[in-house]
Design a protein with these regions (language model features):
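A conserved regulatory-domain signal marking ACT and ACT-like small-molecule sensing domains
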Residues: 1-90
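Glycine/serine-rich phosphate-binding loop and adjoining beta1-alpha1 elements at the start
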Residues: 77-261, 381-385, 437-439
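General beta-strand structural signal in soluble alpha/beta enzymes
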Residues: 78-80, 207-210, 231-234, 289-290, ...
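Glycine-rich phosphate/diphosphate-binding loop of Rossmann-like nucleotide-binding domains
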Residues: 150, 157-175, 233, 237-326
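Adenosine-phosphate binding glycine-rich loop
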Residues: 230, 234, 344-346, 351-445
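Rossmann-like adenosine-cofactor binding region
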Residues: 303-365
């Protein structure tokens, strides 16, 4: 399956005689496009206008597709081409709104001066009351320095804001959490850590997002050590949770015992190392890893994994292959062993296309579009915030992965990312794990 990242909507007019819409669809398919939604916007006396959403791999293929539609003739006309993705981002995707209407002086006195002074004094005397009288305990900072935005790299924090807004929107819709993007105009780990520590009183948790390797490790480790609220780097642990869930589902379908399988991780960056640690936390004994970086391989060794020198060796030794290198086509078909499970997770293009891996004998294969960390972070934070947990442990993350796998339908690797039940189950599993590991402040207080 080729990743098709360019989405456009075509306004196409066709004569009302049968077969003309089929001609348009055929032209789009032959030009390498996929058709999404088709919406009839106007029916004339002898013509019909439709919005047709198409997806293509790149700009060159888009131009070829448009030319193919324009050249159909016979009364078929391409009127406009619009970018609905850009349009959806106009004005941003999130907003901050008041929960209370302020329509009278009495309202004003209750929500602001003079009434608010008494609330401040209550919190001053009993700081724990901030959880009751403010939104702090339900608010998560989404922090980035813009150094590792999706598959785009170091494009800066402002260019990465659409990702942070998307994260905040998902927090709200899937977990009822207030996500606040925090853009940091620094790449210095000390400055990042100090800034987050200074603003942390206003948040119930910290989600680190798209912070590059290797300084992401130091930033997360220091913040987890110094703060008494949960901190998680989503590119590491969110990805690892959903990857473990996908592997659990695949192993269940194939009749494989994951704990006894050999797992090979290609790419030991932020996500790759976290995936290795997640599988080891689950109980997998043989976790192999390959990377060009000697430092990364030493990190893996320190975590208890087994570095290998070549991809061929890793492919030969492993039952389950996971790749997070960002290098398209890195895995050769001839390296694939019969019955392997292959998760090539790099976006926008995977290390091997799922179809190629399956043709070469893989039992299961998927790319990063189906294994999406949106299945993890909303429920994980909902669970830790509900529990009042001060940390996010591997036990909680494994519980989240098992919950996701438990909601996966037969034949799928992971459930639908927008299924509310999935996020509820993840939150419940994480909350239970938090209490079981005695990381919850509320449990310590006797809940």
């Amino acid at each position: 399956m080729i990743n098709k990242n360019i989405i456009r909507t075509l306004l196409v007019e066709t004569p009302s005689t049968p077969g003309n819409l089929g001609k348009v669809a055929t032209a789009i398919g032959l030009a390498g496009g996929d058709i999404g939604e088709i919406e009839t916007v106007h029916v004339g006396v002898n013509y019909t206008k439709r919005n047709i959403t198409v997806q293509v791999e790149n700009e060159a293929k888009l131009e070829s597709l448009l030319d193919a539609v324009r050249e159909l003739g016979g009364g078929i006309r391409l009127h406009t081409v619009s970018d609905d993705v850009l349009r959806a981002h106009e004005g941003g995707k999130i907003q901050m709104k008041s929960k209370m209407p302020i329509q009278s002086l009495a309202d004003l006195r209750r929500v602001y001066t003079p009434g608010v002074a008494n609330v401040c004094r209550v919190i001053e005397k009993e700081p724990e009351k901030a959880k009751i009288y403010t939104n702090i305990s339900n608010t998560v900072a989404i922090v980035t320095d813009g150094t590792a935005i999706l598959g785009l790299g170091d494009i800066g924090p402002v260019a990465g804001m659409p990702v942070m807004e998307g994260k905040a929107a998902l927090f709200d819709q899937l977990a009822g959490i207030n996500g606040v993007p925090i853009l940091l105009n620094t790449k210095d780990p000390d400055e990042i850590v100090q800034t987050v520590k200074h603003i942390s009183p206003g948040f119930g948790g910290i989600l680190l997002e798209d912070i590059g390797s290797p300084h992401c490790f130091e930033v997360e480790e220091r913040l987890k050590r110094d703060l008494d609220i949960p901190v998680m780097h989503d590119d590491q642990h969110g990805t690892a949770v959903v990857t473990l869930a996908a592997a659990l589902s695949a192993c269940k379908s194939a009749g494989v015992d994951l704990e006894k399988a050999a797992v090979g991780q290609i790419g030991l960056g932020a996500a790759g190392l976290a995936i290795c640690r997640m599988f080891m936390a689950f109980g997998v004994k043989n976790v192999f890893g390959a990377d060009k970086s000697a430092e990364a391989k030493e990190r893996l060794k320190g975590y208890g994994g087994h570095p290998v020198d070549s991809l061929e060796e890793l492919m030969e030794q492993s039952d389950i292959i996971i790749a997070t290198t960002g290098v398209p086509g890195l895995i050769k078909k001839e390296w694939v062993r019969q019955g392997q499970i292959i998760l090539a997770l790099s976006n926008p293009k995977p290390e091997i296309e799922p179809e190629e891996a399956l043709e070469a004998g893989a039992a299961y294969a998927a790319d990063g579009r189906s294994v999406n960390n949106v299945l993890g972070f909303p429920g994980i934070f909902r669970g830790v915030l509900n529990a009042g947990a001060r940390d996010i442990t591997h036990e909680m993350l494994v519980a989240a992965a098992e919950a996701i796998a438990g909601e996966t339908k037969p034949g799928d690797l992971v459930p639908h990312p927008l299924d509310p039940k999935v996020h509820e189950m993840v939150a419940d599993a994480v909350e239970r794990a938090a209490f079981a590991s005695e990381k919850s402040s509320q449990k310590v207080m006797g809940r």
